[in-house]
Amino acid sequence: GKIRYVGLSNETPWGVLNFLQLSKDKKFPRMMSIQNPYSLLNRSYEVGLAEVSIRENIGCLAYSPLASGYLSGKYRNNSFPKGSRMDRDWDFWTRYRKPNTNEAVEHYYKISKKFNMISSAACD
């Protein structure tokens, strides 16, 4: 079969532009999407990648929109239920443990309650 559509994951703006140039030079299928983490706690996509995506017409497939559970409301106030993913794999979660994480999660939680929404709906 033929490759008709190409996408990248976890790439930088520089990498995306290099892939676009390579596909043009070699007459490869053009990249159509980029899959990167994106949530209210991780907005790094907005620094460079969003501009490249818009200008080059590349779709964004966001993953971890609820920050792997942080924005669901179940990890509020540094409470990590026994047997939860946070409890089982503490090192993995360092990407979300920042000085303002708990404060941000609490603000999002309060917004959801104010508008009678479940926490995850307020973070979509």
Per-segment meaning from a language model:
Residues 1-124:
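Beta/alpha (TIM)-barrel catalytic core signal, keyed to glycine-rich beta->alpha loops juxtaposed to Asp/Glu
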